[in-house]
Amino acid sequence: MSTTAAPTAPSTLRGGEWLLQPSSRDSLFTPEKLTDEHRLIGRTAQEFVQNEILPVLDKLEQKDWELARRLVQRGGDLGLFGVDVPEAYGGVGLDKVSSLVVSEKMAGSASFGATFGAHANLTIVPLMLFGSEAQKQKYLPKLLA
């Protein structure tokens, strides 16, 4: 009589464990797994970078803060700062992969990518993770717009 072990749920690897632990193909993420929704938000971010940031990159690199402020506002209008923030707070309500796709596209925008990353990761993420409900309702819609 042969017994087989019941399948176990994949565990979450921490830190650099992925370097040391075996992994299955199912645990890997490749661009082929992107959905149409992921591609659409990625295209939106890519067009924003190509059409609105790269043409004025020299001005941004010369610290034209008013221009940077306008571009941050435009990115907010496009929903790029609130990709994975729930709609109830003014976000788009997509998943973390969508947020990753946007961040990847924004990385091609030189120093504006740092501006984008700081706004998204130093203000919005901590507020989502640690803010009270009242703080989220008060601040997130303004930060995302």
What are these regions (language model features)?
Residues E47-F48, E52-A145:
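Glycine-rich flavin
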Residues P10, L20-Q21, T30, L40, ...:
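Alpha-helical protein-protein interaction elements
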Residues E32-V56:
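Mature N-terminal segment immediately following signal peptide/propeptide cleavage
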Residues M1-E37:
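Intrinsic disorder at enzyme termini
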